[in-house]
Amino acid sequence: MNVHNAEIVISAVSPKQYPESQLPEIALAGRSNVGKSSFINTLINRKNLARTSGKPGKTQTLNFYLIEDALHFVDVPGYGYAKVSKTERAKWGKMIETYITQREQLRAVVSLIDLRHPPTQDDIQMYEFLKYYDLPVIIVATKADKIPRGKWNKHESVIKKALNFDKQDDFIIFSSETKEGKEAAWTAIEKFL
């Protein structure tokens, strides 16, 4: 998809704030600082529509981005960030669960995982949760530019094994720095529109 128009529509904390449109939605999930905002910005050819931050735990709402009047990206709060209180974390967890299990417009979830490291327990739980609810998942392995290309396959195998990866899902190696995987990500997303 060639994106010329993208805007943030609303930052929602509850279902009554979700956009009323029937446009398909693609949710973006991943632990704090995995590169969700950079992923959005790369896909929509913008520097900073989605605010990137060195501070983990920055996204605390469901941020709906309208893309080309054709779909919404929904950025969900990053999980696994220790400096957020248990109460906060439980609140985010409930908000994410409500959205993922009840939103009819949700077509697929892009689950972002850092290619450099084995998936965390949170990454694995998120993947299992999405599979339990029968949601199509696109795994995007971020920060590929940080490791030599020759090691990508090994890292991909480690991630797939830890997740007990479903071969029906897409697996994309991605870098917001080099734009590696940008086209593949759009191809995977467009299948669900």
From Swiss-Prot:
Please name the PROSITE patterns in this protein's record.
Answer: G_ENGB
Question: Do you know which Pfam families this protein is assigned to?
Answer: MMR_HSR1
Which InterPro entries does this one have? G_ENGB_dom, GTP-bd, GTP-bd_ribosome_bio_YsxC, P-loop_NTPase
For this UniProt record, give its keywords in alphabetical order, as a comma-separated list: Cell cycle, Cell division, GTP-binding, Magnesium, Metal-binding, Nucleotide-binding, Septation
Q: Recall the GO molecular function terms of this protein's record.
A: GTP binding; metal ion binding
Binding of GTP occurs at: 30-37, 57-61, 75-78, 142-145, 174-176
Q: What are the recorded Gene Ontology BP terms? A: division septum assembly
- List the record's Gene Ontology CC terms alphabetically: cytosol
Q: What cofactor is needed?
A: Mg(2+)
- Residues annotated for Mg(2+) binding in this entry: 37, 59
User: Which ranges carry the EngB-type G domain?
Assistant: 22-193
Q: What is the role of the protein in this entry?
A: Necessary for normal cell division and for the maintenance of normal septation.
| NCBIfam families, A to Z | GTPase_YsxC (TIGR03598)
Q: Which family does it belong to?
A: Belongs to the TRAFAC class TrmE-Era-EngA-EngB-Septin-like GTPase superfamily. EngB GTPase family.
The record, for HAMAP family, names:
GTPase_EngB (MF_00321)
Q: What is this protein called?
A: Probable GTP-binding protein EngB
